[in-house]
Swiss-Prot record:
Keyword tags: Cytoplasm, Nucleus, Protease inhibitor, Serine protease inhibitor
Protein name per UniProt: Serpin B10
Top-level taxon of origin: Eukaryota
Annotated positions for site Reactive bond: R362, I363
Similarity section: Belongs to the serpin family. Ov-serpin subfamily.
Organism: Plecturocebus moloch (Dusky titi monkey)
Gene Ontology molecular function: any one: serine-type endopeptidase inhibitor activity
Gene: SERPINB10
GO CC entries: cytoplasm; extracellular space; nucleus
Keyword ATP-binding: no
Length: 397
């Protein structure tokens, strides 16, 4: 499962860079883990070059064409060994079970499904395998005659699965009579902090979008012993903030320079991120933390993004090979829709009142101010599996 976590985290960074190309000055928030699981469900029925391209984009296997730090190439070759399709999907089965295990300390609601035009029926074996490995049931629907009704039904299903938090995933023109197959993928997350933000400490403060522009935000504040890490090139400060029970952590990467976000995004690699956030790089500080209260709800139509990353055959009527999924010819992936929702606020710590003293340090630790009052990167990690569940940037309140 370690190799799969590495693959998903690498995919998260590659996807974030690709999304950033067309989202200058905009917030980004997505779940690479969930997108990867959705695409792996389709990869299960892919054959030939279609399967090979998907495996490459999802980082299931590496080649010389993928940029990497030279000093870590040898290590990579031992880590990325998911060349066996069965191994990939067994690993996903274990991972999904671990991440979605019932938990009272955070809410993680997912909606993950494939919908295919009913004239392209699925193989029974494929349906069985998808249910076994991914806990999902691909649906055969009537896009040809009732695409708008199907769209509404999909939206209703997603809304139910996410307890009403994610609505209208598919817009009016997102599917039509020529749609063959779509992937829908939506997540809602709300966590409970290990250490509390007090509501009375939240005040309106300026968030500096750049050197000349700022917007008011509700800035939360806490003073607590937290784990800090330093990034030298480019200069940035990192912080780990645990959710209750420490199953999950929020990591924030804050450039020293107000305009330093783009430089940090370009510099980041999987190897660097792993090094920066490793336990031996963390130091405990007495932190004065200023963190904006925010809510992000981002939607993505990923067809062009994934195609440009290298899996174009899956979206091509003439090139796609999904013969492991259906015996009907010309089945291809029409689109991949993704929506993720997160809230970062004080409310998450209501149930954690009094937990601030659970960890005590008798030795004096250095103090530091961590003021997230300008654009930063952040991600939420599932600590047991080392998986990045969500990845984002906050630059526009």
């Amino acid at each position: 499962m370690d190799a799969l976590a590495t693959s998903i985290n690498q995919f998260a960074l590659e996807l974030s860079k690709k999304l950033a190309e067309s989202a200058q000055g905009k917030n980004i928030f997505f779940s690479a883990w969930s997108i990867s699981a959705s695409l792996a469900m389709v990869h299960l029925g892919a054959k030939g070059n279609t399967a090979a391209q998907m495996a490459q984009v999802l980082q299931f296997k590496r080649d010389q064409g993928v940029k990497s730090d030279p000093e870590s190439e040898k290590k990579r070759k031992t880590e990325f060994n998911l060349s066996n399709s069965g191994e990939i999907h067994c690993n996903f089965q274990t991972l999904i079970s671990e991440i979605l295990k019932p938990n009272n300390d955070y809410i993680l609601k997912t909606a993950n499904a494939a919908y295919s035009e009913k004239t392209y029926p699925f193989h029974n074996k494929y349906l069985e395998d998808v249910k076994t490995y991914f806990g999902a049931e691909p649906q055969s629907v009537n896009f040809v005659e009732a695409s708008d009704q199907i769209r509404k039904e999909i939206n209703s299903w997603v809304e139910r699965q996410t307890e009403g938090k994610i609505q209208n995933l598919l817009s009016d023109d997102s599917v039509g009579s020529t749609t063959r197959m779509v992937l829908v993928n939506a997540l809602y997350f709300k966590g409970i902090w290990e250490h509390q933000f007090l509501v009375q400490n939240t005040t309106e403060k300026p968030f500096r979008i750049n050197e000349t522009t700022s917007k008011p935000v509700q800035m939360m504040f806490m003073k607590e012993k937290l784990q800090i890490f330093h990034i030298e090139k480019p200069q940035a400060l990192g912080l780990q903030l645990y959710y209750k029970s420490c199953d999950l952590s929020l990591f924030i990467l804050l450039p020293e320079d107000i305009n330093g976000l783009e430089q940090l995004e370009k510099a980041i690699t999987y190897e660097k991120l792993s090094k920066w956030t490793s336990a031996d790089m963390m130091e405990v500080y007495d932190v004065q933390l200023h963190l904006p209260k925010f809510k992000l709800e981002e939607s993505y139509d990923l067809k062009s993004t994934l195609s440009s990353m290298g899996m174009s055959d899956a979206f091509s009527e003439s090139e796609a090979d999904f013969s492991g999924m259906s015996s009907a010819r010309n089945l291809f992936l029409s689109n991949v829709f993704h929506k993720a929702f997160v809230e970062i606020d004080e409310q998450g710590t209501e149930a954690a009142a009094g937990s601030g003293s659970e960890i005590s340090f008798r030795i004096k630790v250095p103090s530091i101010e961590f003021n997230a009052n300008h654009p930063f990167l952040f991600f939420i990690r599932h600590n047991k599996t080392n998986n990045i569940l969500f990845y984002g940037r906050f630059c526009s309140p």
